[in-house]
Amino acid sequence: MKFRLAAVAAAALLASSASFAGMVTGSSNIDFLAVDGQKANRSLLKETRSFNINDTHTHQVVVRVSELIREGSDRTLFESDPIVVTFQGSTEDIRISAPRLTNEREANNFKANPKITVKTVSGAEIASKQDYLKQEGFLPGVNLEENLSNYNQSGATASVAGFATASMPATVGTVQNGKVKKGKVTVQGENAAEQMLQYWYQQADKETQERFLNWVKTQK
């Protein structure tokens, strides 16, 4: 009897723990750049736009909103600056979303006053603090963790001191003679666009590199 009671109690405990874990997903126009002070990567994200949390503590994400918008008769890619969003976790799954942007006017309005919504799957809105993440240094997107650490130490609107790293190493080394080195990644070029292409090519997996090279061939 004691064994049976212990088994039932253990099962109940495991069930409650499992139900306590929630998944955070983003709308189709949102990309997660960082989660709780760490740069988002494949090991952190279940998919491109989702990750798990298992508590109701304070959490912080950095997101970018991307949309194809109309500019007259043309269509162009709008990408927002990184936006820091701080919110409390929930035992429910959470959805973080941005409004759909279809034209230049809507994109400009969003840029001037970005609004990211945080809700549980049942529809309850979760209070959040939001702020732009200032981008500094060469290749600011690559320096994301360093910039975010500095932001979290600043006491700004959406900062969380607990996610700041006191001595965050620079992600990209000092530029010397047009070269930037980070481990085995080396880029060299006459302008930032060329250096960015080289950097992201070396960061990509082999399949992505092959798709990119095939695409380049079609552009000639």
Swiss-Prot record:
Origin: domain of life: Bacteria
Pfam families: DUF2057
Cleavable signal peptide: 1-21
Keyword list, A-Z: Signal
Family from the record: Belongs to the UPF0319 family.
Protein name in the entry: UPF0319 protein Asuc_1002
Organism (species): Actinobacillus succinogenes (strain ATCC 55618 / DSM 22257 / CCUG 43843 / 130Z)
